[in-house]
Every structure is written in structure tokens, then in C-alpha cells.
């Protein structure tokens, strides 16, 4: 055996290890081509090539367009500032039209920045707590025909959706008209307000606004404050547009604030967004305690009949007493989908899972005493489900 073969065996003891070595070696040397200069080779026969023309391409105060190169460099000798971006080779270019500004940032005193000021009179950097100047790119159209054409312009997708959007808009308008009509009838028939026509319209609009705000999650108190703020703000805008004088604005503002304060103590909105009589906080607390006591004494730990369901539901939904979260809590407690096992009339012990009695539903529960899964039967009375009134509200 030659010396080369002996050395070969020492380096490659068996075919299995050789295959592992070759495979791992090939996995490590797989070349990934990238769009860089050294992808094809690494010969050094062009070390004397021409320079890359590095340096600034636009100077202080020069006007540049989007995409125009401001600085070519190797490394970040100059850092990108406002309204510019930096490329893979550290080239800084403009992303907005404006004027070049070279500056230092107080938060990075050793870095030099270049940015774009959108106006000639602006300097960089922008003060830290000041709003940044943004360019929206709009130009005023003076030709009426061109302006109307631009307003009516829409994309193809938007154009194809117009029938469906118009149908949805019409449905919403019909719902708002029906709601306004219901509120108008309620104010006229249920409450003795003795309001003028103008004040009646103010009251109607206020109730509609408060109802919309409570439906989107605001509390009744926040909705009342927001409704007052919106009305006063609209008056302020009308005054700024010259539609009324400052004296008229002050008079209307004071009148509405006094009107809202008096009206909110007579009529308010319940948890379902419908008009109801105002209840003072003291009376509301007293009614809540009375209703809760009645529910606990008469409807706890017993079978609930259909008549009991309606009674419990009416007590919980008493207008102006509970908010939505309180009503949800009380319904989960006194009108659960399944009665608790503490209601002994609905529990059947020692039931055969394979042959349960008629009208008994087999279920498994965790026994707290034995710490084991227990098989019991529940009668149909244990499953309350939703009331018809609750389904109508859902």
C-alpha cells in the first residue's frame, strides 16, 4: 500500500463519514448571486479605475425634485434628514420637492444632516415640539368646469360600487327618518314639555345625537356633554363664516346651554337609546336596590317559567334605571342559558348515560367535593334560553 493511500484512509476513515463531509461542505459553499460588483469574480485587474464621482450633487438652497440625487458617498458621512431617503450605496435623494438644507441635529450633535425644506423661508431642523410641515400636493383649480370634473371623478371600483352604496345610503336614511319620527311622537305624547317649535326641534335633534353617541359606546353623561359641544362648535363655525354676528352667537350659545340643562332634567335616553323620563341619581339607586332585592328573593335558585322570564326581563329593562353593562350582568345572573346545579329540581342523580329517562339530558360536571368528573341528568326546565323579547332586541 502506497503512502498516499494510507494518508487517504486517515483523512477519510470510511465512506459514510466522507459522504457527510462532502454534503456539509457543499451546503456551506453554495453561492448566492446578488446584484453587486463582486458577483462575477474577485480579480484585482481594475484597481486603477476612475473614481465614482462622489460628493454633493445639490448644494445649500438648491431646488430639487423628487428622486433627484443630493449626495453620493461611501458610508454615512452625511445622514438623511427630513423629506429625504438613503439608498443601499448610501446615496441620499429627495422624496419631496423643495430646497436643500445642510444642518446639525441637537439630539445628534456629531452628525451632519441634509434635508429638504418644503418652502424657501423654512430652516431645518424643525423645532422638536413643533408640527412638521407636510406637502399634500394639491393645486387650486380655478376653472369651474375642471373643478366639477375633478369632484365627480371616481375610480372604476368606486363606480361599480355606486348602486350598492346608494342602496345602503337609502336604507340608512330611511332608518334615521323612522327613528326621528318615533322620537317626535314620543316627545309629543309621553312628555308634557310645552316647548316652542324651535325649541322642540332643538330637543329632538339633541335626543337623536345623544342616542347615536350612546349606541357607539359613550356613557349618557359623556354623550350629553359631547352633544352640547358639537352644537356650540357649529355655531362658532357659522360665526366665523360670517353667517351671524358675535352677539347672535353669544345669545344662541347661552340659550342652548340653559335649554340643555333644563331639558336633560326632564327627558333622557335609556340603555336601548329610546327616550324616557329622567330619574335622579338618588331615585335611580333606590330603584336598583329594590329591583335587585325582588329578583334575589323571588327568582333565585328555582325553576323559571315563561311568565317568570317576562317578569324578570321587564324588571331588568326598566327604562332609565340600568345601563347596558348592568343589564347584561343581571340577565346573565337571573336569566342564564342553563340554570345552576343548585336548583335541585332540575338535577337527576344516578342517571344511566346510555338509557336516560325521558326528558332528561345527560351532562358531565366537575364535582368540587370529590374533585372528579360526575355524570348527572338535567331536566328540560334547566335550559332557559333566550326570551322572545331578548331575541327581538338582539
UniProtKB/Swiss-Prot annotation:
Pfam families: Ribosomal_L27, Ribosomal_L27_C. Its main location: mitochondrion. Residues 145-170 have a biased composition (Basic and acidic residues). GO terms for biological process: mitochondrial cytochrome c oxidase assembly; translation. Keywords: Mitochondrion, Ribonucleoprotein, Ribosomal protein, Transit peptide. Component of the large subunit of mitochondrial ribosome. GO terms for cellular component: mitochondrial large ribosomal subunit. Residues 36-57, 145-181 are annotated as: Disordered. The keyword Transmembrane helix does not apply. This is Large ribosomal subunit protein bL27m. Residues 1-34 form a transit peptide. Belongs to the bacterial ribosomal protein bL27 family.
Amino acid at each position: 500500500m502506497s503512502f498516499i493511500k494510507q494518508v487517504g484512509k486517515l483523512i477519510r476513515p470510511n465512506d459514510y463519514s466522507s459522504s457527510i463531509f462532502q454534503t456539509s461542505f457543499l451546503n456551506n459553499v453554495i453561492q448566492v448571486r446578488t446584484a453587486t460588483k463582486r458577483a462575477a469574480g474577485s480579480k484585482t485587474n481594475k484597481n486603477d479605475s476612475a473614481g465614482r464621482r462622489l460628493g454633493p450633487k445639490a448644494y445649500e438652497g438648491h431646488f430639487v425634485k423628487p428622486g433627484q440625487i443630493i449626495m453620493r458617498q461611501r458610508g454615512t458621512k452625511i445622514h438623511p434628514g427630513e423629506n429625504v431617503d438613503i439608498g443601499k450605496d448610501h446615496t441620499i435623494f429627495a422624496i419631496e420637492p423643495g430646497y436643500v438644507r445642510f444642518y446639525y441635529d441637537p439630539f445628534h450633535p456629531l452628525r451632519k444632516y441634509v434635508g429638504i425644506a418644503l418652502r424657501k423661508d423654512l430652516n431645518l431642523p424643525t423645532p422638536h415640539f413643533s408640527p412638521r410641515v407636510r406637502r399634500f400636493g394639491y393645486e387650486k383649480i380655478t376653472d369651474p368646469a375642471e373643478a366639477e370634473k375633478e369632484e365627480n371623478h371616481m375610480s372604476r371600483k368606486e363606480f361599480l360600487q355606486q348602486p350598492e352604496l346608494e342602496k345602503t345610503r337609502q336604507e340608512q336614511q330611511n332608518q334615521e327618518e323612522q327613528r326621528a319620527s318615533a322620537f317626535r311622537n314620543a316627545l309629543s305624547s309621553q312628555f308634557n314639555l310645552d316647548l316652542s317649535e324651535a325649541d322642540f326641534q332643538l330637543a329632538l335633534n339633541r335626543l337623536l345625537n345623544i342616542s347615536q353617541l350612546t349606541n357607539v359606546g359613550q356613557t349618557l353623561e359623556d354623550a350629553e356633554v359631547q352633544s352640547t359641544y358639537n352644537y356650540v362648535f357649529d355655531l362658532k363655525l357659522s360665526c366665523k363664516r360670517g353667517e351671524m354676528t358675535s352677539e347672535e352667537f353669544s345669545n344662541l350659545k347661552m340659550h342652548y346651554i340653559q335649554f340643555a340643562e333644563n331639558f336633560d332634567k326632564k327627558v333622557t335616553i335609556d340603555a336601548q337609546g329610546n327616550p324616557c323620563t329622567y330619574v335622579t341619581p338618588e331615585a335611580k339607586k333606590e330603584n336598583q336596590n329594590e329591583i335587585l332585592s325582588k329578583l334575589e328573593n323571588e327568582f333565585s335558585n328555582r325553576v323559571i317559567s315563561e311568565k317568570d322570564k317576562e317578569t324578570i326581563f321587564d324588571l331588568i329593562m326598566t327604562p332609565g334605571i340600568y345601563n347596558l353593562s348592568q343589564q347584561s350582568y343581571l340577565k346573565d345572573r337571573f336569566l342564564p342559558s342553563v340554570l345552576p346545579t343548585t336548583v335541585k329540581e332540575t338535577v337527576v342523580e344516578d342517571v344511566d348515560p346510555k338509557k336516560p329517562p325521558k326528558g332528561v339530558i345527560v351532562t358531565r360536571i366537575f364535582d368540587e367535593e370529590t374533585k372528579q368528573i360526575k355524570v348527572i341528568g338535567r331536566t328540560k326546565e334547566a335550559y332557559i334560553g333566550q326570551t322572545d323579547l331578548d331575541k327581538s332586541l338582539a
